[in-house]
Amino acid sequence: DGEQALQASLSVEEKLXIALCLEKTGVDIMEVGFPISSPGDFKSVQTISKKIKNSQICSLARCIEKDIDIAGEAMSVCDFFRIHIFLATSRLHMKSKLRKNFDEIIDMAIFSVKRALRYTDDVQFSCEDASRTTIDNLCRIVEKLINSGVKTINIPDTVGYSIPNELSFIIKNLFQRVPNIDKAVISVHCHDDLGMAVGNSISAIQAGARQIEGTINGIGERAGNTALEEVIMAIKVREKNLGVYTNINHKEIYRTSQMISRICNMPIPSNKAIVGSNAFSHSSGIHQDGVLKNRENYEIIDPVSIGLKNVQLNLTSRSGRAAVKYYMNEMGYKDSDYNIDELYSDFLKLADKKGQVFDYDLESLAFISKQQDELEYFCLKFFSVQSISNGLSTASVKLLCGKKVYTESSTTSNGPVDAIYQALNRITHFPITLQKFQLIAKGKGKDALGQVDILVEYKKRKFHGVGLATDIIESSAKAMINVLNNIWKAKQVNKKLKILKKK
């Protein structure tokens, strides 16, 4: 659901990296895609289904036979999975969107459930726009769905319209009025249009819901979804009051949040609860004094409990790979999370440039190296830029394309970044349009790493790229190379899928 907020679709590799992070964090179920929507989404669901072992895989489908069949096919590589089907139940959606009456809606829902049960005995059903559905209709369809074999009933506040006492009222009524309610798990799926997604989710827990749907950092369509890290920590901090617990590995929360922020190109607001950079900052003198005496005076959460560690790095170009590996382990990274040879090579280059390397530098390098595939088709071997005072620039690049090396110079351009991009385009001939360019400082001071995130459009599809270096122009060039490789990979996936369809 979170991907709907992104300007560019994630690649298969990026989705897998997120899935592995979520698995390590300990989420029970992850909804990994909508396989009917595109060949890329089908491939992502299939790939993740093969790799994830400790979390249950779930796939989304409409109440359409082909949707359900494709979802079942995509996940058939794993032993146990869930199909999540949905259909609107509110009067507004039935009248203006579906143009069907409630009896027809029930028939469609039951037929789809039976279809899904051919593939798995774990079916979840969402009554879309449930918070604006009459309670009588909601109770009626929920009872029939449970009788048909649905194990999880999801109550979505699809447009973020509900307030906590209203959603609590809906959940309580289901428990009071649906005779077979004990045979299913009640779930809620809240949106944040009125800023109440987390509050609504907590009120639903108090009313009896035992599954909460959400996204890390609250990423989602419009104003976003329930921020999982906020619900998780609310449950942990107020466990006695709420009477429930989770199986989450809390110490993975911060790193997962940071990783997803980077992959999705969505910076975390500094005042974001739990994971924002100011979440554990104290500027008031009174507060600072109180925290120094006892952190519990002004902190209800121990920063260490979510994975924040005060690791003091003192790494220079004289530090060995054992030291780099030690600090990565101290920050919570496992050996399988990064390639030590690649990371150490990048570390030495950075240390030679800026002297001392900090924890955030190492994390950024590890993230970028993880994004790079060993078999990248495009590789930037060399570039040079010349600029003059009126803002005009020219650039020369040497680009490895597969096994061939091409050299190209750009004509006069408006700035060094545009000059490099024009030179690269003269070699690749990809009809791309730059839509967004963003520079983020990773660290502090004049030697901070600069991360460039770009968004381009290629044949009506959007692609995201990221580059990291102490030099902004180099970061920009690397970001475009990342984009070009993502486009090339997408083209290869489409070719393979066309061949499979012919077979």
Curated annotation (Swiss-Prot):
It comes from the Bacteria. Its EC number is 2.3.3.13. Homodimer. NCBIfam families: leuA_bact, PRK00915.1-1, PRK00915.1-3. Catalyzes the condensation of the acetyl group of acetyl-CoA with 3-methyl-2-oxobutanoate (2-ketoisovalerate) to form 3-carboxy-3-hydroxy-4-methylpentanoate (2-isopropylmalate). GO terms for cellular component: cytosol. It is an enzyme of class 2 (transferase). Mn(2+) binds at D1, H189, H191, N225. Pathway: Amino-acid biosynthesis; L-leucine biosynthesis; L-leucine from 3-methyl-2-oxobutanoate: step 1/4. One of its GO terms (molecular function) is 2-isopropylmalate synthase activity. Disulfide bonds: none annotated. It holds the Pfam family HCS_D2. Belongs to the alpha-IPM synthase/homocitrate synthase family. LeuA type 1 subfamily. Its main location: cytoplasm. This is 2-isopropylmalate synthase.
